[in-house]
């Protein structure tokens, strides 16, 4: 069989030293920037036909992790092309509409998975899930759009403020360990160079000010 998939509408991207990984609705492609070689991966190769919502490539483990709107995660071992379907999020006793995978962030061998209910740990070496963080008020579900690591803290952009906690805190499952830095609805938090930036639901870019522990300098997209 030969597959014909649209790669025009890119939903998520990730990169390694010399390769760019991109996801469309139900397929992946990668481009080696040194050789210009392009590789495609789709349902014929083993991907799910569900809608992709996030992608991340781990340079350390040479694995590409694909997240879906229904909570499915597929881990691709780039060394041999083998795929592992991980259904732990799908199996959680949560409403189906909260299981969407929004983003992956890696630290110390752990992928922190942002979902519409909170954050989940996934060990990239053992391929096993760890703790789940419900960081909403009083430990409620909260939509986490993206996380970023900055100055020893994990920052979570949510639909109810930007919240942070020490990445080395052993008790992050306790919502009391998370502090709200700013309220409002946020869609992104990311580092660029030596700075931390966040984008709110209105499309304004804010830069984090370490001295005042706040986000300032709004820029309209």
What is the predicted function of each stretch?
Residues 26-29, 69-74, 117-120, 159-163, ...:
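Loop/turn residues immediately N-terminal
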Residues 32-36, 77-81, 123-128, 166-171, ...:
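Short loop/turn segments that connect beta-strands within beta-propeller blades
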Residues 23-43:
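Beta-propeller domains
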Residues 17, 34-35, 60-61, 70, ...:
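Residue-level recognition of short loop/turn positions
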Residues 15, 23, 31-33, 57-59, ...:
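Generic beta-strand structural signal
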Residues 1-16, 42-61, 86-107, 131-151, ...:
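Short coil-to-beta transitions that initiate beta-strands within beta-rich domains
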Residues 57-124:
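A generic tandem-repeat structural signature
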Residues 19-22, 63-66, 110-113, 153-156, ...:
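Conserved beta-propeller blade signature
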């Amino acid at each position: 069989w030969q597959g014909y998939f649209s790669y025009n509408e890119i939903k998520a991207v990730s990169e390694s030293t010399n390769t760019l990984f991109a996801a469309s609705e139900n397929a992946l492609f990668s481009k080696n920037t040194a050789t210009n070689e392009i590789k495609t991966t789709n349902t014929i190769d083993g991907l799910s036909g569900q809608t992709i919502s996030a992608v991340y490539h781990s340079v350390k483990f040479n694995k590409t992790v694909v997240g879906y709107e229904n909570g499915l995660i597929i881990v691709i071992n780039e060394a041999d092309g083998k795929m592992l379907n991980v259904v732990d999020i799908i199996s959680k006793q949560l409403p189906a509409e909260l299981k969407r995978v929004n983003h992956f962030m890696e630290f110390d061998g752990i992928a922190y998975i942002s979902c519409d209910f909170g954050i989940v740990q996934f060990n990239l070496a053992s391929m096993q899930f760890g703790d789940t963080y419900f960081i909403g008020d009083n430990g409620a579900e909260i939509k986490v759009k993206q996380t970023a690591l900055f100055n020893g803290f994990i920052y979570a952009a949510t639909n109810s403020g930007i919240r942070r906690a020490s990445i080395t805190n052993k008790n992050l499952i306790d919502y009391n360990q998370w502090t709200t830095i700013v309220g409002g609805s946020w869609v992104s938090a990311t580092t660029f160079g030596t700075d931390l930036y966040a984008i709110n639901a209105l499309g304004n870019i804010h830069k984090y000010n370490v001295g005042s522990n706040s986000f300032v300098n709004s820029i309209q997209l």
